[in-house]
Curated annotation (Swiss-Prot):
One of the record's GO cellular component terms: nucleus
Swiss-Prot/TrEMBL keywords: Cytoplasm, Endoplasmic reticulum, Microsome, Nucleus
Alphabetical GO biological process terms: activation of protein kinase B activity; negative regulation of gene expression; regulation of stem cell population maintenance; somatic stem cell population maintenance
Protein name: T-cell leukemia/lymphoma protein 1A
Family of this protein: Belongs to the TCL1 family.
Subunit structure: Homodimer. Interacts with AKT1, AKT2 and AKT3 (via PH domain). Interacts with PNPT1; the interaction has no effect on PNPT1 exonuclease activity.
Species this chain originates from: Mus musculus (Mouse)
Lineage: Eukaryota, Metazoa, Chordata, Craniata, Vertebrata
């Protein structure tokens, strides 16, 4: 009887920076592309970022992206958070890699709970 290899989720290092390349495509410092999926509810604003190789188009300027509901850039901060270019903080709720698929879930932190 053939045995299947057990797959375990990895916890990869978080990208130091994510910046928008074109609408719905972010790049990290290694030029890996991340695709966002926005999740909104009454109390929360979350985004799932999936690392997926895509053919990149021309880079867009910030003026071409206005209005855009997500930040144009995120910078990794201590306490598993990103700070966006609008000075808001996003908590990293999870970041896993499973069967070569890497996902990261971010949640916008209420500005009253932003303690540095």
């Amino acid at each position: 009887m053939a045995t299947q290899r057990a797959h375990r989720a990895e916890t990869p290092a978080h990208p130091n920076r994510l910046w928008i390349w074109e609408k719905h495509v972010y790049l990290d410092e290694f030029r890996r592309s991340w695709l966002p999926v926005v999740i909104k509810s009454n109390e929360k604003f979350q985004v799932i970022l999936r690392q997926e190789d895509v053919t990149l188009g021309e880079a867009m300027s910030p003026s071409q992206l206005v209005p855009y509901e997500l930040p144009l850039m995120w910078q990794l901060y201590p306490k598993d958070r990103y700070r966006s270019c609008d000075s808001m903080y996003w908590q990293i709720l999870y970041h896993i890699k499973f069967r070569d698929v890497e996902d990261m879930l971010l949640e916008l932190i209420d500005s009253e709970s932003n303690d540095e």
